[in-house]
């Protein structure tokens, strides 16, 4: 008897239908073809054990299983469930009538329980697109897949429940998730707030500008000055995710297996903070089983690199392409996958090896030339992609002990949202531009033209502060964002003056001591 079951293979953040054909005839051999990897081949032993524990026997027949299309490599253990159900149906142990209406995915334990899989959300989306009535998968993935409407998502605890379902004994109920309600319920909840931080008003303002214009940012300051504390509060002032952004972000985390059992849809912008020992592959993604890296897990959110110069030079260099293109393409001999990577880069660093260069009270003990050498660990092309470079100093005791309440993140967020709305309207006819940070040099001549007083100020600053040529475009982008926060149509001299203050590392005098 020949039967078909249906599964899926995930590539990038999309899925491809895999048709599993099972033929059961007289004989005693077992064949599995269609480019399966080792984990898929090993499913034979898992299926035998799971069926025995569940009260069924693996057929003593000649079984041939073909996984089509044969040119796509089938990887991982998530095919255990469709293979097992296909074998039972081909042997006549269960009714095959409903098999063409449901997609099946799940890894089997030896006791028959179903283990969670990766990529449940993109697979569910593909199942709906292909017209399947339902998707049967491990119960721990059910809420994640139930985000997809017009699809019955049936979460099963073990293979016995799935066998009973196809045998007409019931046992599986659709998982219902009110996507919009859950999305909105958790959107405004943050564990940390800008008001937690005493002082550092200039840095808070710089973070507000960064959030409003989507600008990358680096904070330079001594240990204990609050760099990490401030960076971790940045998501609390970013505009909320739209439903489409949340869906795309959740798909990436689903493929990486990072969506929790009780989570249906990520409702807050991700904040990723990898350790400085991270490898190239962990940063951008890849591996023998392609997985999204930190740049993709931070998509629509923030990638925070603490102690930037301590990262391996090659790791920092691989950031250049996703920062420019907002996606990352991973090409290997066997595959090529594409992951979204539209993130805000926020970094922190000490000003020198000892950490106390320009400190108001503690002397720097670094030898001559070491400060510039330390800064030079970050390449010019990478620094060129960081709009805001601000120095941060320790908070004096008077500020720390101050009882006056600081401004809440919710208040700052409202200003940021208004600025983003202005930019959305400005660039609605421009494909690929959503915020000021994405403007090209050509766009600057249209949307970021300072008045004559501002031009004079900018020229004077370039000469007196020895600002580099690459700072010019960045200053104009920042001044455009600052003007948007003021809800001003034209860029004024005071907008430019503030923007110039955010370009510390461009000054030739920096690190010359």
What do the PLM-derived regions correspond to, one by one?
Residues 219-260, 325:
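Walker A/P-loop
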Residues 110, 303-304, 310-311:
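Residues immediately C-terminal
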Residues 170-209, 213, 240-295:
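P-loop NTPase nucleotide-binding/switch module
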Residues 39-44, 59, 66-76, 289-290, ...:
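Basic, amphipathic alpha-helical bundle interface domains used for macromolecular binding and assembly
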Residues 1-218, 225, 331, 471-472, ...:
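Peripheral, non-AAA+ core regions of ATP-driven protein-machinery
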Residues 221, 285, 307:
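The Walker A (P-loop) glycine that initiates the GxxxxGKT/S ATP-binding motif of P-loop NTPases
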Residues 300, 306-307, 318:
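Walker B catalytic acidic pair
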């Amino acid at each position: 008897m020949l039967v078909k079951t249906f599964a899926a293979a995930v590539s990038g953040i999309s899925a491809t239908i895999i048709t599993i054909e099972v033929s059961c005839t007289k004989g005693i051999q077992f064949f599995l073809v269609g480019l399966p990897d080792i984990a898929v081949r090993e499913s034979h032993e898992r299926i035998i054990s799971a069926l025995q524990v569940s009260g069924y026997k693996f057929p003593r027949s000649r079984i041939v299983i073909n996984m089509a299309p044969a040119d796509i490599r089938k990887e991982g253990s998530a095919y255990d469930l469709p293979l097992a159900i296909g074998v039972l149906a081909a042997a006549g142990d269960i009714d095959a009538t409903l098999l063409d209406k449901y997609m099946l995915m799940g890894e089997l334990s030896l006791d028959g329980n179903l283990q969670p899989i990766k990529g449940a959300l993109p697979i569910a989306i593909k199942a709906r697109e292909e017209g399947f009535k339902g998707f049967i998968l491990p119960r721990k993935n059910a809420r994640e897949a139930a985000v997809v409407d017009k699809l019955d998502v049936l979460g099963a605890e073990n293979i016995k429940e799935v066998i009973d379902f196809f045998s007409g004994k019931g046992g599986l109920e659709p998982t219902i998730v009110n996507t919009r309600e859950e999305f909105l319920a958790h959107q405004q909840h943050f564990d940390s707030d800008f008001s937690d931080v005493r002082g550092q008003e200039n840095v808070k303002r710089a973070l507000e500008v960064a959030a409003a214009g989507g600008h990358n940012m680096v904070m330079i300051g001594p240990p204990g000055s609050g760099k990490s504390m401030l960076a971790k509060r940045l998501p609390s002032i970013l505009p909320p995710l739209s439903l489409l952004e949340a869906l795309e972000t959740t798909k990436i985390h689903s493929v990486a297996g990072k969506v929790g059992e009780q989570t249906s849809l990520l409702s807050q912008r991700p904040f990723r903070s990898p350790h400085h020992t991270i490898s190239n592959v962990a940063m951008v993604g890849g591996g023998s089983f392609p997985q999204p890296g930190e740049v993709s897990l931070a998509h629509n959110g923030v990638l925070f690199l603490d102690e930037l110069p301590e990262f391996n030079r090659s790791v920092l260099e691989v950031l250049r392409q996703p920062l420019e293109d907002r996606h990352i393409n991973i090409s290997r001999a066997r595959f090529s996958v594409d992951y979204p990577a539209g993130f805000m880069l926020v970094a922190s660093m000490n000003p020198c090896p000892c950490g106390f260069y320009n400190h108001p009270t503690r002397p720097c003990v670094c030898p001559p030339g070491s400060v510039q050498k330390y800064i030079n660990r970050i390449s010019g092309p990478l620094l060129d992609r960081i709009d805001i470079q601000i120095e941060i100093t320790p908070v004096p005791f008077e500020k720390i002990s101050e009882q006056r309440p600081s401004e809440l993140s919710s208040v700052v967020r409202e200003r940021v949202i208004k600025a983003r709305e202005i930019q959305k309207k400005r660039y609605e006819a421009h494909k690929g531009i959503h915020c000021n940070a994405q403007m090209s040099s050509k766009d600057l001549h249209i949307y970021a033209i300072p008045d004559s007083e501002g031009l004079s100020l900018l020229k004077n600053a370039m000469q007196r502060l020895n600002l580099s040529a690459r700072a010019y475009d960045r200053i104009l982008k920042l001044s455009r964002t600052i003007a948007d926060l003021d809800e001003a149509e034209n860029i004024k001299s005071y907008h430019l003056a503030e923007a110039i203050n955010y370009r510390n590392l461009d000054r030739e005098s920096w690190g010359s001591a």
